[in-house]
């Protein structure tokens, strides 16, 4: 995670979740202009997209300098991803472990598709810096979250578009507790509280049950990782 020249512009993959909200704050701290990109791909937890407005409003209120840097927000609909994916993230089926130790929430190629679309949009808008919340420390084992995958894709995108894109993954080597700590480092308790209250992680789209770490079913893999990270973050902060 190196600081970038303030004159550069970044495109942040922003779903409305904890990780992408933290990455947005990270980008706003480092770049002169930041735009966001979300994807509506038929996910069960599409409510995450609705959470983005509250997060953006909270961040710009929290830090006026961030408000000056924040630019256009984009949303791309790619329903085909759900149509070709028989997963618990795109179908109303129980979440369980599949073959090879991967949960059936894994959507094959999702991050590859997201980053390719992001690069195409960045190309059109004259950007070369793309920020994503991929992580292979506290994660569900998804192969498209791994550092070697992201580096390989960066090479492919640069060759395929004849550009010098840089794919930033500031959370790659952080566990969930460290991700909470990074949010505090970037925006203090105000940002941590904003992410707790308004970001969405739960794969089932549950926002009726409130926990110390935020809203969710508390049982899906995403909720368990978020809850575990929150407890460890609080313990480390004592």
Curated annotation (Swiss-Prot):
Reaction(s) catalysed by this chain's protein: 7-carboxy-7-deazaguanine + NH4(+) + ATP = 7-cyano-7-deazaguanine + ADP + phosphate + H2O + H(+)
GO molecular function, one term: zinc ion binding
Database matches in InterPro entries: QueC, Rossmann-like_a/b/a_fold
Cofactor(s), by name: Zn(2+)
Biological-process GO terms, alphabetical: queuosine biosynthetic process
Keyword list, A-Z: ATP-binding, Ligase, Metal-binding, Nucleotide-binding, Queuosine biosynthesis, Zinc
EC number: 6.3.4.20
Cofactor note: Binds 1 zinc ion per subunit.
UniProt binding sites for ATP: 14-24
ATP-binding as UniProt keyword: yes
Entry superkingdom: Bacteria
Pathway(s): Purine metabolism; 7-cyano-7-deazaguanine biosynthesis
Pfam families: QueC
Binding sites annotated in the UniProt record for Zn(2+): 202, 217, 220, 223
Function in brief: Catalyzes the ATP-dependent conversion of 7-carboxy-7-deazaguanine (CDG) to 7-cyano-7-deazaguanine (preQ(0)).
Record-linked NCBIfam families: 7-cyano-7-deazaguanine synthase QueC
Family recorded in the similarity comment: Belongs to the QueC family.
Designated name of the protein: 7-cyano-7-deazaguanine synthase
Organism of this sequence: Nitrobacter hamburgensis (strain DSM 10229 / NCIMB 13809 / X14)
């Amino acid at each position: 995670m190196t600081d970038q020249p303030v004159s550069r512009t970044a495109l942040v993959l922003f779903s409305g979740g904890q990780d992408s909200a933290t990455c947005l704050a990270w980008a706003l701290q480092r770049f002169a202009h930041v735009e966001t990109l979300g994807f509506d791909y038929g996910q069960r937890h599409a409510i995450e997209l609705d959470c983005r407005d509250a997060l953006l409003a909270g961040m710009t209120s929290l830090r006026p300098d961030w408000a000056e840097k924040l630019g256009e927000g984009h949303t791309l609909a790619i329903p085909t991803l759900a149509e070709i994916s028989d997963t618990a993230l795109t179908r109303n089926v129980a979440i369980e472990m599949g073959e090879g130790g991967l949960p059936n929430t894994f959507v094959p190629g999702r991050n590859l598709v997201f980053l390719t679309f992001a690069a195409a949009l960045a190309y059109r808008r004259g950007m070369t810096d793309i920020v994503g919340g991929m992580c292979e420390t506290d994660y569900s084992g998804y192969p498209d979250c791994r550092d070697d995958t992201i580096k390989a894709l960066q090479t492919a995108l640069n060759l395929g578009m004849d550009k010098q894109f840089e794919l930033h993954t500031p959370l790659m080597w952080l566990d969930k507790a460290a991700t909470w700590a990074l949010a505090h480092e970037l925006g203090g308790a105000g940002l941590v509280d904003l992410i707790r209250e308004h970001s969405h992680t739960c794969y089932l789209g549950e926002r009726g049950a409130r926990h110390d770490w935020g809203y969710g079913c508390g049982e899906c893999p995403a909720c368990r990782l978020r809850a575990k990270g929150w407890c460890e973050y609080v313990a480390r902060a004592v």
